[in-house]
A protein has these predicted regions:
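Short, amphipathic C-terminal "tail helix"
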Residues: 91-128
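Generic alpha-helical structural context detector
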Residues: 9, 28-32, 56, 100, ...
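Glycine-rich phosphate/pyrophosphate-binding beta-alpha loops
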Residues: 1-23, 105-109
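Intrinsically disordered or highly flexible coil/loop and linker segments, enriched in small
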Residues: 1, 63, 82, 108-111
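Gly/Pro-rich interdomain helix-loop hinge
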Residues: 14-94
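Homeobox/homeodomain signature
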Residues: 1, 7, 44, 75, ...
Length: 128
């Protein structure tokens, strides 16, 4: 389930925000953070190739990069009017607690790479 669900479950426990909307609002920020962390810490990871394969599938372009895939998902979220965390009522001053609690969630343990506190905070900032 990974970081999307790990963070979303914490937010859902703190705010009356629909789980699916929280997950969707976090998706592209988590994708970016995962790819960045993988490229810098484990560039040989096959997960990077999986992100590229997803980009090929969603864009219909066999030469699409993982960045193209992320842009496709960003556009989809805009088209579907997925709310940002701010619109879902999440308070920025609670980001540190969300990070701490997210690291304890069982879902985050299945993320393809362990994310640092600063990476988790950046996800929240990006999705805000």
């Amino acid at each position: 389930l990974g970081a999307v669900h790990g963070i979303a479950s914490v937010i859902g426990g703190m705010y009356p925000a629909p789980h699916g909307e929280v997950c969707a609002s976090l998706l592209t920020a988590v994708m970016r953070a995962n790819i960045s962390a993988l490229m810098s810490r484990t560039p040989e990871s096959r997960v990077i190739q999986r992100y590229e394969r997803i980009a090929h599938l969603v864009t219909g372009n066999s030469k699409a990069s993982f960045s193209d895939g992320i842009e496709w998902f960003i556009k989809l979220c805009q088209d579907l009017e997925i709310p940002r965390l701010k619109r879902l009522g999440v308070k920025k001053d609670e980001f540190p607690q969300i990070v701490i609690s997210s690291k304890l969630s069982s879902s985050i343990k299945s993320n393809p790479i362990e994310l640092t506190d600063s990476e988790l905070l950046e996800i929240l900032e990006t999705a805000y």
